[in-house]
Amino acid sequence: MVEACWDDNNNKWRTLIKRFGQEKEMGEDYTVTSDFLVSAVGQLNTPKYPQITGLEAFEGKTMHSARWDWDYNIQGKRVGIIGTGATAAQIIPEIAQHTSQLTVFQRTPAWVMPRHDKPISKTRQAMYRYVPFARRRYRAKLMDFRESVFEASVLPQSARHSHIANVSRSHMLTQLPSCASTKLRAALTPKYPFSCKRIIVSDDFYPTLLHDNVKLETSPISEVTPTGIKMADGTHHDLDLLILATGFRATEFLNTIRLYGTGGQSLSDTWAKGASAYLGMTVENFPNFGILYGPNTNLAYNSEILQIEAQSLYVTRLISAVLTQKRQGNTLRIQPKPEVVANYNDEIQSRLSQSTFADPGCTSWFKDEHGRITTNWCGSAVEYQKRTCYLDWSDYVILGSGAKEVEKRGVERWRRRVEETWVSDRMLGICAAAAVMAAITGWVAWAH
């Protein structure tokens, strides 16, 4: 997919599909016509390649972590990996056991939290299988914990913010305890506030850096040579494979696709000062268009699936309205009012400005080139679910022969998917105790 244009005359989207490589053998380029268009490419889809002198001159194997070559055998190879973010923290422990030498090139250290991975005992597995309530309760408690991390990690004024940062520091001391690790700990200690960049959750990243065949390199990279990487201090690392764990062009939403809305207005022009959308899903002047995992919907502390599920339910209502009117022989064109989009984004930007993400001393993929936070959501996952479990039709410009019928609906509501606990442990205990007392009282009465 390379281009999508809204046809004002026919109230349709026309999407151009180009065939590349072997797909050319299947036929020519073609156009798909639709009543509604949904972008489900998300935020993390286009690899970001580092601007390093000589990168293209490297004669060994180079691959971005998001474009992994599974046919390449790393066994016994001298491997370099650029980056120590979330992707690198997952790759490094896995490949270190197969390489003859692994050099980790770090520009900025990351805050690392413990994952606490451990096997679930057979007893607990049986309990979760045969006592569904116990399984659901455990899952809900996990959700409660993840939601509690929001305030502690994202809001610097929170009483728990310094505590959770200390948990990360203790995790490092636990995993790198020896005096010999003093220099390594210093190199891995962040000099920026906790949570202003993406936090790594790992139990095996730090220990892997202690392996004899693993070296952490913190000197700036000078250039890539045909045989490896030369550092600013003159050191040269010979490599067979160079892995680029350098992330994605996260703030450049839909950057590989040309989108044109009403009057031929391009999405790139609309978002010239930063991507924004109403509830992260709909954009002014782009009718019958929805986005999943769009601007300001990323969660830095909980599962993104929660957001995408909420968005899917919302966008489905928009699609349903368009298709229902089409079946009745009517046309329908839905787009958010500009003032609604503006007010919504003013609110979330105001809240985000008070978060750790906005720290001026911190650069991250959460911010665009202007310093505006365009990726992250400003609240908890539950708050977002509650804000997207209803559709207020007055928020939208509705045109077409079916417009009046849709406008009369007012506000449509649906039940959100509740993942958190409904009742506290204390209340459960009181209810259980009351049930036991009632049972005993009943038994005594029956016995007499």
Name these PLM-found stretches.
Residues L37-A180, V214, H237, S266, ...:
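Rossmann-like dinucleotide-binding core of oxidoreductases
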Residues R14-L16, K183-I200:
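Helix-loop-beta segment of a Rossmann-like dinucleotide-binding subdomain
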Residues M1-R14, D71, D212-A232:
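A conserved short coil-to-beta-strand element within the FAD-binding core of flavoproteins
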Residues E23-F36, N73-K77, A232-L241, A245:
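Core beta-strand elements of the Rossmann-like FAD/NAD(P) dinucleotide-binding domain
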Residues I52-T62, T227-G280:
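Central helical "cap/lid" subdomain
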Residues W111-P114, A126, P132-F133, R139-D144, ...:
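C-terminal, flexible cofactor-proximal segment of oxidoreductases
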Residues M1-Q43:
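Feature captures the FAD/FMN-dependent oxidoreductase FAD-binding
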